[in-house]
Amino acid sequence: MIQKETNLVVADNSGAKKVRCIHVFGGTGRRYASLGDQVIVSVKTAVPGGIVKKKDVCKAVVVRAVKESRRKDGSYIRFDENAVVILNAQGEPRGTRIFGPVARELRDKRYMKIVSLAPEVL
C-alpha cells in the first residue's frame, strides 16, 4: 500500500538508493499503489556517479510491498520492505541489475525485463 509521501528503497543499480513517492498512476482519485503499479518518485539519496541523481523525478514500478497482496489461488504475498525499480520513458528498467526477490505479479503486468533480471521471483 504505497501512497504519496511513502519512502521507498530502490531495488536496482540505477544509482538511487532511497526515493519518495510523489504520485500514484491510475486516475485522479487513486490513493494507493500495490505490486506492479507505476508511481512517480523523487530521488532522496543517490550514489555518486550513478545514472540518476538526487532530486531527479522518475517513473518507477513497485516490486515489493509490506502490505500483503491476495493472489487468485487464495494465498497472500508480503515482503519486509517497500521497494521499486526505476523506469525510463519506455517503461524499461534504467539499471542493469535487480537486487532481491520480486513478486510474480510483475509477469502478469508485462514487466518481463524486470522478471528476467531478478534473482528470484516469488
From Swiss-Prot:
* One GO CC term on file: cytosolic large ribosomal subunit
Molecular function GO labels: large ribosomal subunit rRNA binding; structural constituent of ribosome
In terms of InterPro entries, this protein maps to: Ribosomal_uL14, Ribosomal_uL14_bac-type, Ribosomal_uL14_CS, Ribosomal_uL14_sf
Q: Which HAMAP family match?
A: Ribosomal_uL14
Note the PANTHER family from the entry: 50S/60S RIBOSOMAL PROTEIN L14/L23 (PTHR11761), LARGE RIBOSOMAL SUBUNIT PROTEIN UL14M (PTHR11761:SF3)
Q: Which domain of life does this protein belong to?
A: Bacteria
What organism is listed for this UniProt entry?
Chlorobium chlorochromatii (strain CaD3)
The keyword RNA-binding is assigned to this record: yes
Q: What does the record list as GO biological process?
A: translation
Similarity comment text for this entry = Belongs to the universal ribosomal protein uL14 family.
Q: What is this protein called?
A: Large ribosomal subunit protein uL14
Q: Name one Pfam family in it.
A: Ribosomal_L14
Q: What does this protein do?
A: Binds to 23S rRNA. Forms part of two intersubunit bridges in the 70S ribosome.
The uppermost taxa in this organism's lineage are:
Bacteria, Pseudomonadati, Chlorobiota, Chlorobiia, Chlorobiales
Q: What SUPFAM superfamilies does UniProt report for this protein, alphabetically?
A: Ribosomal protein L14
Write the record's keywords in alphabetical order, separated by commas.
Ribonucleoprotein, Ribosomal protein, RNA-binding, rRNA-binding
Assembly and partners are described as: Part of the 50S ribosomal subunit. Forms a cluster with proteins L3 and L19. In the 70S ribosome, L14 and L19 interact and together make contacts with the 16S rRNA in bridges B5 and B8.
